[in-house]
Amino acid sequence: SVLTLHALKNYQNYLDFDLVAVSVDEGIEGYRQHGIDAAIDNAEKLDVKLVQKSFKIEEGFALDDIYSGFKSACIPCGVFRRNILNKTAYDLGADKIATGHNLDDEIQSFLMSFARGDLIKFSKFGPELDVIHPKLIPRIKPLWNTPEKEVGTWAILNDINIHLDECPYSHLSLRAKIKEFLNNNEDIYPGIKNNIMESFQKILTFESDIPSN
């Protein structure tokens, strides 16, 4: 998300658009505050307005309070975070929500949906999600084709304050297992992630060419 913010700030030198950053505190004790601090620091340095939201204020509870009622904490976290981001963007009058999803995130999500047989979610993948409801703000993913390692390398080379720690709940998720599998195989077979992404893009192209009726 921090790299996305820096990239969009740079694009303002060439394109005329307003930019507002949004942070969401899910309520994970001992973890989330580091990310919030990094968001505040980067927004101040870039002179970008930062709107801070939290599960506690917007939804009435912290993720720590409710995660035990779900198979994975990622389930409620994703739902409520997306809802808060969309509501905030709608209230701000934004035309787009730009997220920090990178190549690794995308192929993990793709394989998760494939493993679950949830082919309906395929339409939600890709660098841009079109309007599907008047109150849902379209999403863009500027880093869609950028590997996670390159994002980390950029931050180190440019001395950017980012939060690299893994979420303490992530190890319980299917995503964590798939991420580990992909990273292990990338070490053995370099380029496997890019190959999966290329296959993924072909599937999306094929799917879009199929008549709906």
What do the PLM-derived regions correspond to, one by one?
Residues 86, 105-187, 192:
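Catalytic subdomain that performs nucleotidyl-dependent activation
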